[in-house]
Every structure is written in C-alpha cells, then in structure tokens.
Amino acid sequence: MVRRTKEEAAATRDSILDAAEILFAKQGVSRTTLQHIASAAGVTRGAIYWHFVDKGALYSAMMDRATMPMDAAVKLLDERPVVDPLQRLRDEMMAVLQIVVTDATARRVFEIATLKTEFTDEVDSARIRKREAVCEWRGRMEAQLAQAQSEGTLP
C-alpha cells in the first residue's frame, strides 16, 4: 500500500470534488454514480470512500467548498456595525451575487443545488441542509426588514 502525503491526499480529494461537480452539473446528482466520479477523477471508488462516507457526504463537501466564500463575505459584513438595515441587506445580497457571477465553481454548484439535485435518500442530508440554509437566510432578511420598519425606513 502506498502512503500518501497530506498534500497528495488533499489533491486527490479536490480532484474527486472537481469531478463530482462537473458530472453533477452535466448529468444531475441522482444519475451520477460514484463509479462515474471515480473514473472522471482518475481514482478508485475506494479512494472516494477514503475521503467521503457516501455520496451524500461528497455532495455536502462540494457544497461546503463552494459556499465558504459566500459565508466568509457575509461574516465580514456581520463584523461591521449596522447603520442602515436595508443597505446591509443589499450589501449581503450583492456580496453573494458577486461571488456567483465571478466564481465559476460557485455558479456551477448553485446551479446543481437549484436545478440538478433530485432529493433522494442518498442526499437527504443535503435536502435538510438546504432547508436550514433557506430558513437562516430568510431569518436574516426578516430581522433586517423588521429593523428597517422599527426605524421607520419601511412602512
């Protein structure tokens, strides 16, 4: 058995995620098998299982990788004091949209999440995660709109 360095393991993991992202975008999540991903990444299915417990975990890791820049952008905005809640809401939306527009990976993963994911049992954790993310985003928007109303900026 060949021992791999941390860098080689990280590169293998990234190539698996890259292959999954491309195939999910092309074929949809439910029609893409782990064997398809392994072949496209030039690895064995065993290598996939070394990094990811199942297809759902692989899907979640792909989502995490693409949403990290968005989460970081919103977190930076959270560190600033809120002067105008409507401007904060606009800034958050613009930060996320700017990443989707300029980052091909984020754009492709957003497309996969919204158009190419059939929520089956194998990616049920992704369905739950998506629902939680939507609820969190809605909560943020509601809080900012409520603050704007209380300040008289909105009727």
Regions inferred by a protein language model and the residue ranges of each:
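Short, intrinsically disordered, charge-balanced linker/junction segments flanking boundaries
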Residues: M1, K6, Q147-P155
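Basic, helix-initiating cap at the start of DNA-binding domains
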Residues: M1-Q27, R31-V43, A57-S60
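Amphipathic alpha-helical segments enriched in hydrophobic/aromatic and basic residues
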Residues: F24, T33-L34, R45, K55, ...
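Short coil/turn segments at alpha/beta junctions that flank glycine-rich nucleotide-binding fingerprints
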Residues: K26-S30, P81, D103, E151
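Hydrophobic alpha-helical connector segments
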Residues: A61, K75-R108
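Amphipathic alpha-helical packing segments from all-alpha helical-bundle domains
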Residues: M68-D71, K75, V83, Q87-D91, ...
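Amphipathic alpha-helical segments used for helix-helix packing
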Residues: R88, T102-I128
